[in-house]
Structure formats: structure tokens, C-alpha cells
Amino acid sequence: MTTSTPHKTRSTRDIFNTRFVFLMAAIGSAVGLGNIWRFPYVAYENGGGAFLIPYMVALLTAGIPILWFDLAIGHRFRGSAPLAFRRISSRWEGIGWFKVGVNFFIAIYYAAIIAWAALYTIKSVTQAWGDDPAEYFMGDFLQAEPEATYSGHIVPSILGVMILVWIVCIATLATSINEGIGKLTSIFLPVLAVMFIILVIRAFFLDGAAEGLNAFFTPDWSVLSNPSVWIAAYGQIFFSLSIGFGIMITYASYLKPRTNLTNTGLVTAFALSLIHI
């Protein structure tokens, strides 16, 4: 599937220098909590290794087709989600803004999680959490009340890092697609891959690692008749591939005018699925 773009937008839209840079940006936008944190426990709760069957079905029947759809819209109409949908029909522009709204709320809690991770990276040098990580996280780190479900208390150290995170994000978005997102993802995604490999190797030597691996890779085939397992698989696909959020629409708008979207979508989808497993 190769698409061409409207003539009037070809000279006014920046483009990724290479397909590799686009792939790094696309994969980097999807690799996160949905891959590293959410997928393992969803698989564990839904039959372990057997969950891979509904997951692969969901990938082939929903994930890849919707990813192609996002890529095609962004590439054909050369704009962010609201602009792309408006160019299709003014009545559809609201769909694009809905996607922007979803991403706005995601960015709010992701900034907090990134701040936590950055601070924990520093504190890991001395293992500041000691023998009781849970108590340290809720008490010393978040400074939250034991029974509180919500607190308006501001933790200066976390706030400072969050402000820094937002400054970096805004500065990145203010630069060109290649000098900003393209360059950063091309550098930090390989770094993430190395860190992830180290984390996995470290996890193999933790107490209970063998039991966890056995639980994950021992399939419970009986769950395949449970509709909730299939619903969980299809839900996971949206987290895993970052589809339906308008992100891939925007990224695809920066692809070269003549691009093989079929191959690009397949590489992106299967690369992300490999990371999960």
C-alpha cells in the first residue's frame, strides 16, 4: 500500500529524513507502560502463555489494520489528527480533537511517572528504599497519608523533576521533526533497549523468578473459551501499538510523499509485539 499526498501540502510539511528515524519515533511512542508493565500482568491474569493466541489474533485482525488506517490518514492528509479529519470532512474534526484530549490526560500522568522514574534512578545508587520499598514509596517518597486515596500535598523534589520533564517535552516539540523527536528517539530508544535487557537479566535472578516464568509460559488453554480474555487481548493491542490515539496519524504526516505504508506498518507492529514477549 503506497499513497501519494495532495500537491498543495507537499512543500509545506517537514518530513523524516529516513524511514529508520520514523520507525524509531513510532516504536518509541508505543513502548512504555503498555509493553513493559501492562502486558506481563494482563497475560498472567488471562491464561499465561495461552494469552498469546488471542493476542496474535487481535494483532492481525485489529492492531495492524487500524495501524494501517492511522498511517494512511496521516500520510494522505498531511496533518495532525484534527487537521487530517477536517480535511476528510469538517464534521469529523471533532474526532481528531477527542484524540488530542485523550493524549492530554495521558501526558499528565505520564509526566508524573517519568518524574518518579528519574528520581528512583538517582536513589537507586544508594538503594534509599532499604528493606521496605512499599513503605518508602508511600511515606518518604510520595509523602502520602497511609489511608489517603487523594492528596493535594506537593512534593518539591517530584514537582521540580516534573517541571524539567515538561520543559524538555515542549522544547522537543518546538524543534523540527528530525532535530527533535527524530534525533532523541534515535538515541534513547537503543539506550532503552539496553537498559531493558539489563532489567530482564536482573529479574531472572530475583526470588520467585522461576515461579513467575513457569506461570507465564505454562498455558491454561481453558481460558480461550472465556470472552473476557479476548476482550483483554483486543484492549491490550491499543496500548501496545499506540493506535487510535492520533499519534500514528501525526507521525505518518511527516513521511515522504511516496512511502510503502504496508511494510512500514508491519515492521512497527511486529517490532512492538516482539518487545512485549
Residue ranges and their predicted role:
Residues 1-37, 66-71, 75-87, 94-98, ...:
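Membrane-interface "cap" regions at the ends of multi-pass membrane proteins
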Residues 2-6, 11, 185-241:
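Helix-loop-helix hairpins and the membrane-proximal interhelical loops
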Residues 10-13, 42-46, 81-98, 113-174, ...:
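Inter-helical loop and helix-membrane interface segments of multi-pass membrane transporters/permeases
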Residues 13, 40-43, 170-176, 232, ...:
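Helix-loop junctions at the membrane interface of multi-pass solute transporters
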Residues 18-58, 211, 247-255, 264-266, ...:
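Transmembrane helix-boundary motif of multi-pass solute transporters/channels
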Residues 43-69, 95, 157:
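Extracellular loop-to-transmembrane helix junctions
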Residues 58-62, 102-108, 114-122, 161-174, ...:
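Hydrophobic core segments of alpha-helical transmembrane domains in multi-pass membrane transport
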Residues 276-277:
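Conserved small/polar residues in nucleotide/adenosyl-binding loops
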